[in-house]
Amino acid sequence: MSTNQSNSVIGKLAIFGTSGFAYEVADVAVSMDIEKIILLTNEKDFDNVDERFEVLHESEVSNLVEQGYQFAMGIGEPELREKVFNKFNDLEYPNLIHKNASLGYGQRELINKSQGNVITAGVAMTNNIQLGNFCIFNLLSTVGHDCIIEDFVSVMPSVNISGNVKLEKGAYLGVGATILQGQLDDKLTIGEGTVVGAASLVRKSVPSYKIVVGSPAKILKDISK
């Protein structure tokens, strides 16, 4: 899935989703001076114009491609993002990086090796962070050095991820969660599909498909695959 992106200008962007996060993605696009922004829905009945952006049905995707649109995911849930990608996997998904995000030396070039990531206002990433595809980093979240973040990870507002952490595919970190430091050769790992509850403090690795909550975080229950 990985792709090596250029720094070409995005002129037209269609965002999958019409929920609140889709509008936050649109905010990122506005900060990047993207001139034409529309939202896409899979609902049969919808208003095609609101006060901010035109809304179209996703059946219009092929027409939008012909018009030169690129695409983004305005969907917070990892599984739904992956579902949409599997349905529309041949589109061009640029990375969206808010102008007020902070990236360490060389980090933008690393991000450009991936696709479909959304980095919102106030996010801070240091350096040598390996980023997968279609991840979201919400307001004021931070990512430390030498982290590995796989596809479809969701990082909610004010999450702090220390250095040498690995987030496996589809992990979801709730608002204000903190992930403590791992080791360069033994990273603290949040397993595939695992959910870390809001304001939780994770001090050690967590297996896949678990819900963990608390400070320190403890396993609350398993998640059905």
What are the roles of these predicted feature ranges?
Residues S2-S6:
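N-proximal low-complexity "stem/linker" segments adjacent to membrane-targeting elements
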Residues I10-A29:
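Glycine-rich adenosine-cofactor-binding loop
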Residues M32-V49:
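NAD(P)-binding Rossmann-fold cofactor-contacting core
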Residues D45-G104:
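Phosphate-bearing ligand-interacting subdomains
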Residues F71-G74, I119, V213:
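Redox-cofactor binding/interface segments in oxidoreductases and associated redox assembly factors
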Residues P78-K87, L91-C147, D151, V159-I161, ...:
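Left-handed beta-helix
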Residues E150-D151, M156-K225:
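Glycine-rich hexapeptide-repeat left-handed beta-helix
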